[in-house]
Every structure is written in structure tokens, then in C-alpha cells.
A protein has these predicted regions:
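Positively charged n-region of N-terminal signal peptides that target proteins for export
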Residues: 1-4, 119
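Sec-dependent N-terminal signal peptides
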Residues: 3-15
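Subset of outer-membrane beta-barrel
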Residues: 18-178
Length: 178
């Protein structure tokens, strides 16, 4: 019973975390200050405006056991540049926990497009689909799905200066529980 209470405390923080960014070792190592850098495959999640600045296809993947409590995070992403001004990216992220009593799964699928109309400016947008499921003793206590949108900007006014802005969940991410 004590373990069950601990699991509920942990999962309540995860459930209401509102799409925390656990993506990429480098962005996390930078304390999340990756919005203006946005120069690898993790830019799909952090700032989609970085996509057209990538000059080759990129694939990224990670797996982590968070908090040493069998809460796992899996991530896979791929970016395809089309010329010098446009790139698209897809990624999938899963945070989950599964034991004999309690299970939780949070899946997110992103589709991102980035466009660089000028050398100084690039913009990007992400459409995301979210699916969540929580159960206890084999019984589902909440399934939800929803969609959301993100928008990103990168401005490079100088060779050694880049400014980034990411707007997450524009208009609110609508997640409906069934």
C-alpha cells in the first residue's frame, strides 16, 4: 500500500506536468537553453524554426530510466531538409511506467515544418498528437487524446548571435479524457 501511494504521488506530478521536455542529452545538459541553438535533430521538440538550418538528414534516439523507478522515456526523431530553406521533421516520445498494479503511458507524435525565408530569419511550426492512458490492476482509469500546436522563431542578426523564441501549446493543447 505504501508503494501504491508513492506511485500515485509521482504520477500526479507527471500527469500534470503539461508536456515536460525530456528530449536530448545536449539540450538537457544546457539546462534547457536550447531554443536559440536548435542545431540538431532535437530541434523538432525544442524549436522547429531550427529545422531549415540543418543541412543533412538527421536521426536521433534516446532511452532513459527516469528517477531510477522504472519510469521510462523513449524518443526517436528524424529530420529531412529539402533544399536550403525548408525542412520537415517527425518524432515520437513516450513516457511510461508499467508494473503489476499500476501502468501509465504518455505518447506524443510531432510533425514539424521549418522555413527560412531570409538568411537572418527562420520560422517553424509543430503539430502534435498526444495520447495518454492510466490504469490500475488491469482496469483503465483514464484514456485521453488531444492535439496541440507549437511555433518557433530564430533570428541571427550577427554571425555570433542567435535569438530564439518557442511558443508551446498555442491556444492550449486540448486533451480529452474518455
Amino acid at each position: 500500500m505504501k508503494n501504491l501511494i508513492i506511485y500515485f504521488i509521482i504520477f500526479s506530478s507527471i500527469l500534470f506536468s503539461q508536456d515536460q521536455l525530456f528530449v536530448g542529452t545536449r539540450p538537457l545538459g544546457m539546462g534547457g537553453a536550447f531554443t536559440a541553438v536548435a542545431d540538431d535533430g532535437n530541434t523538432i521538440t525544442w524549436n522547429p524554426a531550427g529545422l531549415p538550418r540543418l543541412r543533412r538528414k538527421e536521426f536521433t534516439s534516446s532511452y532513459a530510466d527516469l528517477y531510477a523507478m522504472d519510469i521510462t522515456h523513449s524518443y526517436t526523431g528524424i529530420v529531412w531538409p529539402f533544399g536550403d530553406r525548408v525542412a520537415v521533421g517527425f518524432d515520437w516520445s513516450n513516457v511510461g511506467f508499467d508494473d503489476q498494479e499500476l501502468n501509465y503511458s504518455d505518447n506524443k507524435l510531432n510533425f514539424s515544418v521549418g522555413y527560412q525565408p531570409f538568411k537572418l530569419l527562420s520560422i517553424g511550426g509543430t503539430f502534435k498528437y498526444i495520447s495518454r492512458d492510466m490504469g490500475l490492476d488491469g482496469t483503465s482509469y483514464g484514456k485521453s487524446t488531444g492535439i496541440g500546436y507549437d511555433l518557433g522563431f530564430l533570428i541571427s542578426p550577427h554571425k555570433k548571435l542567435r535569438l530564439g523564441l518557442s511558443l508551446y501549446d498555442l491556444g492550449g493543447t486540448d486533451v480529452t479524457y474518455k
